[in-house]
């Protein structure tokens, strides 16, 4: 046997190893693990494989500096909470660490097992903690550099126990609250910034986003299914500089999982539930990823379907469990690498919700009985599409998003007057929006200076039509059509004053043209058409400033000033249409945070905020019993919030959160001077606690258990004595157990463990405010489910 081939191979291997060990300039932008691995492989001349679906949706920060290829790959793996395994001289595999749910705990107690040729990571002192990149910052800011109160919910946590909507967010974040008219019809509030109980011409106080595009402008929460998400980010407000109008309370951003360019898989869940004093429920979910062009393009699709059994009875109609709700939703994302460092995403989403009847009951009647003599209910349909181009040129990043949304909500309310024939009030809210945003930025990361500049355009049209149905009679009630065209430029710049101290200044200028007209007006008003049609221009300048200081690794404090606004519009009162003014919020806050939730042994975030809210827009009940809108005065809101968690053992984590709100309307308008004293719909105190337990129970089985309880304090329904009923003051609870592995698992969950009736919302129909209505919690529900992947 000749030795030359062996000697030649050894020389090549030594040469390759020497080249890999040589330090070189590395600059890999922030992105998902597969995106970062591709960029890393190009720059280091190595082969890097990321095949585990658990890792493909994780995000990594920018990796920048001079280092060898092995050092760079180890750093990439560490930032993803994974490990690098050398499979050859210049080839690597990035895989999850054993028992990833307890990775932080294991690292605290002992070094990881290097088995199967794993490359040992550098000592802890040489590798900084994995930074968490906040997508909602719009410029890839790490959590420790962000001067804001933010809550992050992992998508895998949301997926446990079957599909769900916004209620899964309110259960996990104490500062987020909601009305409870029904799925697809609710209003959301953050940080005690609440205006009213109804959805009318006023813009929402919370901005909701799917990726970079807003879900709606002045429509209710569409209650999208939270399936196949990387995570949800709740950024407390105001967020006027970055997000503009309609972010007084903050924003909720849904970050979907990106398609995986080199993977083919399908996952799904099936579930069946039984509700005490109610009908059975069923739900199903399917997720599919298809690689269209390996390494270049992929398609990811999600389908959700559910039928939730009712639990409200209407004895006057001799019907039980009337409020069954059916939901059908689908989402598709096509992701393509169109050039080095440039990608294209096309996203489409559709959802339809049908509520067969209302979900409120009589306060003093049997537990779940409604005294309505008519069939109510609602339909909520939502369509959404967006087109996203993103990339980078050197250190400069760019992202451009264009899209459209359509939301249609039809509601039926019992409008029967005492001693009169049965009557139904029907309201149709049809909203259409076209939006565009382009921004460029240089992330601060380890630089001295970072900045962001952007522009956005919004065109929104909202048509509100109403009618009364009494027997075969149909009579139209006055409606309104509001339109808005808005142009905005904004910017933000951060400067590192010294190591661990970053100052940020920002501003946004918005110019909007508002239009409005009455719909279905009476003949007398139609003759005077100039009195019911109006167009005007408004502008707003929203400055912001913040300072964040790192006291130690993982510990920082910050102070921030921010503003927000909502444009005015036209409101209906009786048979007349009138104008209401824009409102404006100014907030000063101070906060501190330590650690990374669910990763570090201990984490804590606290925040105190003071808000001055001028010309508050709110809804009230007019003389005809219909919802109307007006400016109710000026107010002040104090908010204190805290959240944290601690690992009691390697397997057991305790978490909790609480919020305290104090509000006053200190300069009410003349009409409301004797009717209001504080902001409605916000409890003075709310809090939650949870326990998470995870461990291996066999060679290929993991056990995950969750238990939680939350308390929602008392709040007032709305503005005026007609809406003065109290609500809240109840405890909700639940638990979930899953046993299985990544391929298949079974779940058992129970909601409303204590069987609490409670009162989530003291209104079901605005025409029967004297009936003392309540909206009870769904009775105790037990669900069995199975999830699978192949």
Task: Give the positions of each predicted feature.
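Structural signature of Gram-negative outer-membrane beta-barrels, strongest in the C-terminal barrel
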Residues: 334-340, 347-349, 440-442, 450, ...
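Short acidic/polar hinge/loop motifs at secondary-structure boundaries
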Residues: 198-199, 206, 211-238, 330
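Membrane-embedded beta-barrel scaffold of Gram-negative outer-membrane proteins
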Residues: 132, 285, 388-393, 397-416, ...
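N-terminal periplasmic accessory domains that precede
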Residues: 92, 166-169, 188-189, 209, ...
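A beta-strand signature from Gram-negative outer-membrane beta-barrel systems
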Residues: 215, 226-269, 789
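Gram-negative outer-membrane beta-barrel transporters
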Residues: 503, 511-512, 605, 609-612, ...
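C-terminal beta-signal and adjacent terminal beta-strands/loops
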Residues: 710-718, 738-790
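Transmembrane beta-barrel wall of Gram-negative outer-membrane proteins
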Residues: 267, 276-355, 381-383, 432, ...
């Amino acid at each position: 046997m000749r030795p030359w081939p062996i000697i030649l191979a050894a020389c090549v291997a030594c040469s390759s190893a020497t080249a890999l060990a040589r330090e070189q300039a590395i600059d890999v932008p922030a992105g998902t693990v597969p995106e970062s691995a591709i960029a890393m492989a190009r720059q280091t001349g190595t082969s890097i494989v990321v095949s585990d679906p658990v890792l493909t949706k994780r995000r990594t920060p920018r990796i920048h500096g001079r280092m060898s290829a092995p050092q760079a790959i180890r750093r990439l793996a560490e930032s993803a909470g994974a490990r690098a395994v050398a499979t050859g001289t210049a080839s690597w595999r990035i895989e999850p660490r054993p028992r990833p749910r307890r990775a932080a705990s294991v690292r605290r107690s002992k070094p990881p097992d290097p088995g199967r040729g794993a490359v040992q990571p550098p000592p802890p002192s040489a590798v900084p903690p994995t930074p968490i990149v906040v997508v909602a910052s719009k410029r890839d800011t790490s959590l420790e550099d962000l001067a804001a109160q933010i809550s992050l919910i992992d998508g895998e946590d949301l997926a446990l126990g079957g599909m769900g909507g916004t209620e899964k967010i309110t259960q996990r974040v104490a500062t987020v609250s909601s009305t409870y008219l029904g799925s697809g019809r609710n209003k959301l509030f953050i940080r005690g910034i609440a205006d009213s109980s109804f959805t009318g011409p006023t813009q929402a106080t919370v901005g909701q986003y799917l990726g970079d595009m807003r879900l709606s402008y002045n429509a209710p929460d569409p209650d999208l299914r939270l399936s196949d998400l990387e995570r949800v980010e709740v950024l407390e407000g105001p967020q006027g500089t970055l997000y503009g109008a309609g972010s007084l309370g903050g924003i909720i951003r849904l970050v979907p999982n990106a398609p995986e360019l080199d993977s083919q898989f399908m996952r799904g869940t099936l579930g069946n539930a039984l509700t005490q004093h109610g009908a059975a429920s069923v739900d199903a979910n399917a997720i599919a990823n298809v690689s269209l062009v390996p390494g270049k393009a992929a398609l990811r699709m999600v389908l959700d379907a559910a039928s939730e059994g009712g639990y409200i009875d209407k004895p006057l109609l001799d019907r039980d469990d009337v409020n069954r709700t059916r939901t059908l939703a689908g989402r598709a994302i096509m992701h393509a690498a169109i050039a080095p460092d440039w990608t294209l995403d096309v996203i489409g989403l559709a959802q339809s919700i049908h509520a067969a009847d209302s979900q409120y009951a009589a306060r003093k009647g049997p537990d779940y009985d409604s005294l309505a003599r008519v069939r109510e209910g609602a339909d909520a349909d939502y369509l959404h599409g967006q087109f996203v181009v993103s990339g980078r040129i050197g250190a400069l990043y760019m992202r451009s998003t264009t899209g459209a949304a359509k939301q249609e909500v039809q509601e039926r309310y019992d409008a029967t007057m005492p001693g009169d024939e049965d009557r139904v009030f029907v309201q149709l809210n049809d909203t259409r929006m076209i939006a565009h945003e382009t921004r460029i930025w240089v992330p601060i990361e380890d630089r001295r200076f970072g900045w962001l500049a952007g522009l956005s355009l919004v065109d929104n049209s909202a048509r509100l039509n109403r009618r009364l149905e009494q027997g075969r009679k149909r009579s139209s009630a006055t409606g309104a059509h509001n339109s808005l065209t808005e142009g905005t430029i904004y910017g933000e710049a951060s400067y590192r004053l010294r190591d661990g101290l970053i100052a940020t200044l920002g501003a946004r200028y918005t110019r909007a043209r508002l239009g409005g007209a009455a719909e279905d007006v009476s003949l007398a008003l139609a003759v005077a058409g100039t009195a019911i049609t109006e167009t005007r221009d408004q502008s707003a300048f929203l400055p912001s400033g913040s300072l964040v200081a790192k006291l130690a690794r993982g510990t920082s404090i910050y102070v921030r000033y921010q503003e927000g606004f909502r444009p005015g519009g036209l409101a209906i009162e009786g048979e007349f249409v009138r104008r209401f003014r824009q409102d404006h919020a100014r907030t000063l806050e101070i906060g501190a945070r330590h650690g990374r939730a669910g990763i570090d042994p201990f984490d804590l975030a606290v925040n105190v905020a003071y808000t001055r809210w001028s010309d508050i827009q709110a809804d009230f009940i007019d003389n005809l019993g219909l919802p109307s809108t007006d400016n109710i005065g000026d107010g002040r809101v104090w908010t204190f919030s805290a959240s944290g968690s601690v690992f009691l053992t390697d397997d057991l984590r305790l978490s909790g959160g609480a919020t305290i709100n104090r509000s006053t309307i200190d300069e009410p308008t003349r009409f409301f001077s004797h009717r209001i004293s504080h902001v409605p719909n916000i409890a003075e105190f709310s809090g939650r606690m949870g326990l998470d337990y995870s461990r291996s129970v066999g060679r290929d089985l993991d056990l995950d258990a969750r238990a939680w309880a939350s308390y929602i304090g008392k709040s007032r329904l709305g503005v005026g004595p007609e809406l003065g009923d109290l609500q809240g003051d109840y405890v909700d609870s639940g638990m979930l157990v899953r046993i299985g592995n990544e391929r298949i698992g079974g779940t058992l969950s129970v909601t409303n463990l204590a069987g609490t009736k409670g009162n989530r919302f003291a209104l079901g129909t605005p025409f029967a405010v004297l009936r003392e209505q309540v909206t009870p919690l769904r009775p105790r529900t037990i669900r069995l489910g199975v999830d699978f992947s192949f």
